[in-house]
Amino acid sequence: MKYDVEYSKTAMNTIKKMDSSTSKLIRTWIEKNLIDTENPRVKGKALTGDLKGLWRYRVGDYRILADIQDDKIVILILDIGHRSKIYL
């Protein structure tokens, strides 16, 4: 089954605030790698500690934090940010 991608309000606001080249890079990566994928875990890495249960995807120096909801067949993008600030 193919997964759909949904964005949280936080993720949408972050994308809108980014410069256009970074925003385009991230949106393109999501379109190519997550939309309609059959296994969203292949490109990501499971997080541990306080963020256990979430997944992260690397796009250059940026990270996409997501919740993979198998029961709904949805990848919920929770937040997007620079690798130095996203986990704070």
Please describe what each predicted stretch is:
Residues K2-V5, K9, N13-K17, K24, ...:
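Enriched for short, Lys/Arg-rich terminal
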Residues K17-S20, D36:
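Secondary-structure boundary motif
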Residues K32-R56:
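A short, surface-exposed loop/turn module that caps and links secondary-structure elements
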